[in-house]
Amino acid sequence: MCIRDSKKAYVYAIENVVTGLLFGAPHDDFDFIISEENGIPVIMECYPDAFRLSFKGKKCSIYEISDEGFMRGVTSWSPEFVSENEVAVVREIAVNDLYSRLLDEESCGNLIIRRYEDAEDYKSIIAEHIVDRLVRFDAVYTEDKKIKKHYGKIIDALKDIMDGHLL
């Protein structure tokens, strides 16, 4: 069971195995934007080399479970199902090299990886996402070294805007 934004204990599940694999290693909203296009998971790097840094050398397991008792629409992310009850594992699939597996899924057309681009349109999408997350998660004054390293200029600009001098 896991407790997240809802503050309620849920078992979280996703139908698409490849999307599930994207959660096989620790990362957060400051590393990627995860979405879907025509049923195919899409992962956009929020900074250069985020994909490799997050998944290389990582192992994970994904679990096939019964869909009984799962509800859709409880969380803000449409691919996600939740259950308030513990569920039995039907089958475990061990993944010994998550990075290679995800690259294989990309080459088979089952995953779209948008690697970081030094292009204004790409960076604009990422900047909008990061600003939203910094404000939403009250992270403007964070001490997190990774966030400060990649988004220090955005954080400084937000602090400048939020100090009240523009009112």
PLM segments and residue spans:
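Conserved NAD+-utilizing ADP-ribose enzyme module
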Residues: 24-167
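Short, small-residue-biased leader/transition segments that mark boundaries at the very start
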Residues: 1-3
